[in-house]
UniProtKB/Swiss-Prot annotation:
Annotated family: Belongs to the RapZ-like family.
Keywords of this entry: ATP-binding, GTP-binding, Nucleotide-binding
Top-level taxon in the UniProt lineage: Bacteria
Recorded GO MF terms: ATP binding; GTP binding
Protein name: Nucleotide-binding protein lwe2422
Organism the protein comes from: Listeria welshimeri serovar 6b (strain ATCC 35897 / DSM 20650 / CCUG 15529 / CIP 8149 / NCTC 11857 / SLCC 5334 / V8)
InterPro entries named in the record: P-loop_NTPase (IPR027417), RapZ-like (IPR005337), RapZ-like_N (IPR053930), RapZ_C (IPR053931)
Residues holding ATP: 13-20
Amino acid sequence: MASKQLKLVIITGMSGAGKTVAMQSLEDLGYFCVDNLPPSLLPKFWELMKESDKMDKIALVMDLRGREFFDSIEPALDELDNTNFITTKILFLEADDKVLVSRYKETRRHHPLEPNGSVLDGINAERELLSDLKGRSQLVINTSNMAPRELRERINNEFQTEDKDVFNVQLMSFGFKYGIPIDADLVFDVRFLPNPHYIDKMRPLTGLDKDVYEYVMKWPETGAFLDKLIDLLMFTLPFYKREGKTQLVIAIGCTGGQHRSVALTEYVGKAIQQKYETTISHRDMKRRKGR
């Protein structure tokens, strides 16, 4: 059986240049991320990853916090270059001296190479030690004039998978009586619609049942609301994606999360599915039946 091809991104560069933001961005893109792995463990780590059938994209932050970094990084990279089941890309982050000094002053941290001395001396020493590694990097990003959001957007543009954009919309119905979902990005209240709960034969059913679904959908206000809601979502979703979000949770609530919210979540989910990867769930639909 042929070995699977693994993707490795090594995040390195100047201290204070944004390596943490880069790692978080790659994690959002589906990469398994490891912070501060000693270079000498890199080949052994990859042998373990090769055996895993769940991981094919790995991002490693490697920098001078590992004291052996400068002695062992080059041999480790040479060994990776000779490994045929790994595609390696080195991402090097840097920033101008003035910007790095300012960032250190804001955080009141010491530079790791000059813990008791001048921050600028530490920056200069680090820049010199990293010069060879910067030269063999496939992607160098200067973050001097970048806000964290802009760096995330740049990382997304560089590393998003070619076959499919990484953006998932999660549609969730819920009941207000059980609380608003804490992970919801957008919440819509549909308690203004006629309630099937007050019709005896529909009370034990849910919005997944045909009778309830058709009852909820027959009202003019339902159709008007759905048209406006879907139009709003189709307008705003591309902008959420542009801002670097890889997941958006949309919660639609009624009183108990049984009828109206379930029916509308199903309808909206099917509309969104035509353009975006979409997951539909009903948080509170089974609560009453379970009692």
